[in-house]
């Protein structure tokens, strides 16, 4: 059964460039992982200070998620990147989770 990783971020406009660069770097790694089907990076204006960014990744099934997570953790470790510290520094709020289709 296909599964979906859906992450929603509230991103201050002044953090946009740095955050999108990191998101694109992560998605480049994810696109090369076994079980990857497709992804979407979506944005929505929120107000004068921030916008919503939603990332959606479709996986063949849940068995591929741990390997993909490990690949991203390796990327972070090799580059010295700490996601929690970066999100705090950039003022980004996140709501992240893995979902399955109701109609499957």
Regions found by a protein language model. Give the residues of each.
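A general secondary-structure junction signal
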Residues: 43, 98-100
């Amino acid at each position: 059964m296909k599964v979906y990783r859906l992450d929603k971020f509230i991103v201050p406009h002044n953090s946009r460039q740095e955050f999108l660069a990191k998101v694109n770097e992560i998605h480049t790694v994810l696109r090369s992982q076994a079980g990857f089907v497709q992804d979407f990076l979506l944005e929505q204006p929120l107000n004068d200070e921030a916008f919503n960014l939603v990332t959606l990744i479709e996986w063949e099934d849940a068995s591929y998620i741990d390997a993909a997570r490990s690949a991203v953790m390796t990327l972070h470790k090799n580059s010295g990147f700490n996601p929690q510290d970066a999100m705090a520094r950039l003022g980004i709020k996140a709501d992240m989770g893995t979902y399955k289709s109701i109609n499957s």
